[in-house]
């Protein structure tokens, strides 16, 4: 019943990409901690926006059990970074070179891990494949920034939301009522 109510209420929502869309990329990553009650694995969520419009998103259960929120957020940031690097390579094909793409994360601890080139005993257990994010921070491909949880757009990919948060995040992702846009275009 809830699913049908959701579908009925969102059937006219869509993404609108005006012709004068710029090339400013930003990304958001988030995770829950142990959200799957069967195996206690966390969910990584991320989204990438081009000039404030959603162009890529992901929500995936992590392959290992994170033992802290910082670890779960770090793994999610690494997954988001790989998507950012792919988008950068696609834009380079069109001679658009972008560096220092902002990646927003709501975990100060995960951000500190990204900036720390030294492995400490508390992070040695994290699989090596996730540490490539440090290289991209050092090389200036991405910049990790803190974002308040209340402004985290990737929340929609990791957890259920109340209606107010849901509507706020949809607007932040550039989702609009496409019926109203198509009406205004036909009237012009």
Name each model feature, range by range.
Residues 1-2, 14-15, 129-134:
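Intrinsically disordered, low-complexity boundary segments flanking structured domains
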Residues 23-24, 42, 49, 54, ...:
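RNase H-like nuclease module associated with reverse transcription
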Residues 29-52:
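Acidic, metal-ligating active-site segments
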Residues 5-29, 96:
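Structured nucleic-acid-interacting core domains from mobile-element enzymes and related host factors
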